């Protein structure tokens, strides 16, 4: 489970409600008891539920029921029902709706990608990158995990990933073996992941025996060719495809033999459509 602190939950609420709801105050309805319900109009893999519930309880509302993160909801299914005073209900309305719409959009997009991949490779995986929309990293992470995806890198400090931009600063930027050996010496408990931007680089990298080789923006034909020769050059190396991988392009790579894909596309998926209903207790 991705942990969001109370301060982060408060920040999500404060984006919208720091001044309260003027309309509710002006109508003098804030003291009334009522319910709020969130429905997913189109169905799909849901996430953001636990965060949404924390936001609602922070406002003093009581959660009556909620689905689980990662569950497949039907079109029109209720995701959350909560109760409390109308002032709190109206304060939580849009802030929670925004979190649910964005999170569910991310998780359902990735779930569709995984379903497509696993029709061909049941053991296939999709890892999502650090390139999330600024300020959404933790929300993005919970959405990715809810859909069954992997976190590619949560940050720079705990994983090794050798890019061309690192190699540019080396004395010999084509010395893959030297760079990989140095990384193994100075980070002996870490897997060595490297990225190649062209087939020639990929072959040179494979000869240096990395643990994982990322192929960046390779065509399906180029990826297939590298996948065919990789076992003879580096039998223990895992191949991954990255760069431009999304729900539309993924199908073009399903014949190349690579089972690990790296993408940031789900972060930019269309938000889900969440319907919200607020009603006084007497009408429920």
Swiss-Prot record:
Is Lipid biosynthesis there in the keyword field?
Answer: no
What's a Gene Ontology MF term here?
nicotinate-nucleotide diphosphorylase (carboxylating) activity
Cellular component (GO) terms are:
cytoplasm
GO BP field: NAD biosynthetic process; quinolinate catabolic process
What are the entry keywords? Glycosyltransferase, Transferase
- Report the protein name in the record: Putative pyrophosphorylase ModD
According to its UniProt record, the EC number is 2.4.2.-
Q: Name one Pfam family in it.
A: QRPTase_C
What else the UniProt entry mentions is: Orthologs of this gene seem to exist only in pathogenic strains of E.coli but not in the K12 strain.
Q: Which family does it belong to?
A: Belongs to the NadC/ModD family.
